[in-house]
A protein has these predicted regions:
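Short helix-boundary/capping micro-motifs
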Residues: 12-30
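A short LG(V/I)-centered, amphipathic sequence patch enriched
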Residues: 42-59, 64
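Alpha-helical linker/hinge and terminal dimerization helices associated
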Residues: 44-45, 66-88
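Central regulatory/effector-binding core of bacterial HTH transcription factors
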Residues: 92-154
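Beta-alpha-beta core module
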Residues: 155-160, 165, 225-277
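Flexible hinge/capping segments at coil-to-helix
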Residues: 159-167, 171-193, 283
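Secondary-structure junction motif
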Residues: 181, 191-215, 281-282
Length: 291
């Protein structure tokens, strides 16, 4: 038995809105038409999906199971239509690459430039994402490859370290360490480290704090209020320090100084992708980045 993708799309809207009224408005359907679509889908599947009440709509266990598969199913269908239309128009194959703020746009561009995949036969689309968005965007096929500073891929995804970048220190131009050509991690014992996400939630934050502990001190740290911005900008307007991968020297129009960190310490760039997908282009890209 085949699934009617229109009904699946209707179901996803109901599941996400938890309301027939809001879902109908989102789909630009009448509530009666949407209700009929949901009843028809339940008949086709032979199981109830929704618990309907005056307070709204809740998913039954069967509905939760269908929703988990429906989102990537719709994304795959949309992607398939896009690929077919691009092929018909003779347009290049599209590979969508997401990256978190800790892997800067400049670093992504430098890694991609000159790869076999970067040719006129391929279109590379780069998208900036927050760390907690990356896994979901891979699962729903919004992106094909995710680049992050994580040490392991999100649950249910495959991953490979494709690069390592040297860590350095970023401080405000007026900071007491700004005149230094190089610092060591123990030099930061009295400083407040600005990180991009909370410890215990972000693997990269845990990695950076772990490096400080290995250097012999428990780091004071705080999370930047500016989410989605490059790490080098997180020291603007405060006296904190940030561990970054930018080149040494002035940054952010001279408002920030990037200082060498000794001895040399590197952090990974992890490429992640879906286990249930096959892409020769993605394989070439990952192999090229790792070489």
């Amino acid at each position: 038995m085949g699934l009617d993708l229109r009904k699946v799309e209707h179901f996803v809207a109901v599941a996400e809105e938890r309301s027939m009224t809001r879902a109908a408005a989102r789909l630009r359907l009448s509530q009666q038409a949407l209700s009929m679509s949901m009843r028809a889908l339940e008949r086709e599947l032979g199981v109830p999906l929704l618990d309907r009440s005056s307070r709204g709509v809740a998913l039954l266990a069967s509905g939760e199971a269908l929703y988990a598969d429906a989102v990537p199913l719709l994304a795959a269908a949309t992607a398939a239509v896009g690929r077919a239309r691009r092929a018909d128009r003779g347009e290049p194959e599209l590979l969508r690459i997401g990256h978190t703020p800790a892997v800067t746009g400049i670093e992504v561009t430098e890694m991609l430039a000159g790869l076999p995949a970067a040719s006129e036969d391929v279109a590379l689309q780069v998208v900036a994402l927050l760390p907690d968005e990356l896994g979901g965007r891979l699962r729903d096929r919004f992106i094909d490859v995710g680049l992050s500073r994580a040490t392991a891929p999100p649950d249910g995804l495959a991953g490979q370290v494709v690069a390592r970048h040297r860590l350095r220190l970023a401080v405000r131009a007026a900071h007491r360490l700004a005149h230094r050509l190089a610092v060591t991690l123990p030099d930061l014992a009295a400083e407040t480290l600005v990180v991009g996400a909370p410890a215990g939630v972000c693997a990269y934050t845990d990695l950076l704090l772990g490096l400080c502990r290995q250097a012999g001190f428990e780091p004071r740290h705080r999370v930047t209020p500016f989410q989605g911005t490059p790490p080098v900008t997180t020291v603007l307007g405060n006296d904190g320090v940030a561990l970054v991968t930018e080149a040494p020297g002035p940054a952010v129009g001279g408002a920030v100084r990037v200082i060498e960190l000794e001895p040399e310490t590197t952090v990974p760039v992890l490429a992640s992708w879906r286990l249930d997908t096959r892409s020769a282009l993605r394989a070439v890209l990952v192999a090229g980045l790792a070489s």
